[in-house]
Amino acid sequence: MTSPNILLTRIDNRLVHGQVGVTWTSTIGANLLVVVDDVVANDDIQQKLMGITAETYGFGIRFFTIEKTINVIGKAAPHQKIFLICRTPQTVRKLVEGGIDLKDVNVGNMHFSEGKKQISSKVYVDDQDLTDLRFIKQRGVNVFIQDVPGDQKEQIPD
């Protein structure tokens, strides 16, 4: 089994939206968006809504649970240029623990909620988020905060 061609993994609690569909996908040259989310993988309505973005901009889209991603991503065809989208750092950590080789993890949007502190203009984290991001980074993955491709990359605080 060959390694899948994962161009980028993004943490964005909005998952698929116009910014992901237009800016990120075209900038990195992806032709397949894989949404890794246990809830969305079983929600036809959310899949249809996100699928509209994919259809509009001409790239493929799949919706997988964490477990299915771990089990099938290695079977991706070489021509598939994959952009993984996850809602939380916990999801990405589970992918790494499951043996998926990630090179770059972009933290895009993590909205404010009670108990979270701001670490950049659009990223709010709690202690568990930071623990998971540091775990991912300690596994040799390049983890950075960047809203859109033209913005300067910021590092996760140690």
Swiss-Prot record:
Q: What class of enzyme is it?
A: transferase
- One GO term of the cellular component aspect? cytoplasm
Which GO BP annotation is one of this protein's?
A: phosphoenolpyruvate-dependent sugar phosphotransferase system
Q: What is its EC number?
A: 2.7.1.-
- Output the CDD domains linked to this UniProt entry: PTS_IIB_man
Asked if the Swiss-Prot or TrEMBL record annotates the protein with the keyword Transferase, the reply is yes
Q: Name one Pfam family in it.
A: PTSIIB_sorb
Query: Where in this chain does the record put each PTS EIIB type-4 domain?
Result: 1-158
Would you say which domain of life the source belongs to?
Bacteria
Kindly indicate whether the keyword Cytoplasm belongs to this entry: yes
Q: Which cysteines are joined by disulfide bonds?
A: none
Function comment: The phosphoenolpyruvate-dependent sugar phosphotransferase system (sugar PTS), a major carbohydrate active -transport system, catalyzes the phosphorylation of incoming sugar substrates concomitantly with their translocation across the cell membrane. This system is involved in N-acetylgalactosamine transport.
Q: What is this protein called?
A: N-acetylgalactosamine-specific phosphotransferase enzyme IIB component 1
Which organism does this record belong to? Escherichia coli (strain K12)
